[in-house]
Amino acid sequence: MLNNPQALVNHLHNLHDQLQKALLAALTAADVKSTVDDLSAVADVRGGDTIYAIDTIAEEIIDAYCEQWAAAEGPLVLISEGIEDAGWKVFPHDAREEDARFLLIFDPIDGTRNLMFNKRSSWALSGIAPNKGRETTLVDIEVAMMTELPTSRALLADQLWAIKGEGAFRRIRNLHDGSEQDAQIRPSQETTLSHGFSSIAKFFPPGKAAMAEFEELLFEEVAPNTGENPLVFDDQYMTTGGQLYELMVGHDRFTADLRPVFFKKLGLPAKLVCHPYDICVELIAREAGVIVVDEH
């Protein structure tokens, strides 16, 4: 088990808040100057991930914070996109993996494509697990936090977190005056999908036709439409963390990301699918009462 999980939550609050403020400032400046395209420029391709210019802002903040954190309190391992060696990075750099007090898995901007064009909020996602070496899995995560990364037009932004076995928590920040207010987390209480949002993830062209056909057949079965108007509404929110958020606060009733299943069936390369860091805040959803299962 993790020692003093609340202290870890406090660190995540600080780090996430720095990310939110820096990215919002960059978006606001780009919006004013009409230079949003600069944030969407490809900066690098590393570890199988496309790194956009906006990603580099977040990477620098996380690296600097982890350096200070490790120097003050002892070694840690950061697991994130764009890092070589299977995404693992030890802080301080002369420490050994096995000496790390914990593993920090981080997706700095989940939904980069939403944010870099200033279209829709993305999310900073992080989870902390005891160091069980390379055998550590998402199930081992005991602390998780997700923070909304809003567009330059937003007034409010959410932050949610959980400690395993202690429930999930939510705070809303006013981006204009910095004030914060605790808020409830309440998934939908409806017992059907009718007159609500439910979706099968199909963000990109490969496999979209097959996934859309499956979606149509599925909803015809579970929410048959006998009238003129559709009963199930679709929202392709291109961020796994954002999808979980929509379920947690009752905006959505059902979401399934079956891209790897369809890609395998169709003989397509498994590109742009959900990675472990994309789903590292699943603990928050479970603690909030969302039912999370695999494809089986």
PLM-predicted stretches and their roles:
Residues 62, 66, 124, 128, ...:
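Buried hydrophobic packing segments
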Residues 1-109:
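N-terminal subdomain of lithium-sensitive/metallo-dependent phosphomonoesterases centered on the IMPase/IPPase/PAP
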Residues 45-51, 110-114, 230-234, 270-271:
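A short glycine/serine-rich beta->alpha loop
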Residues 56-61, 72-81, 124, 242-257:
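Conserved long hydrophobic alpha-helices within structured protein cores
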Residues 71-74, 136-139, 191-192:
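Short helix-terminating capping/connector loops at secondary-structure junctions
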Residues 97-165:
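DPxDG-like acidic metal-binding loop motif
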Residues 9-12, 16-19, 23, 27, ...:
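An extended, acidic
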Residues 49-57, 115-119, 238-241, 272-279:
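Short, conserved micro-motifs enriched in small and acidic residues
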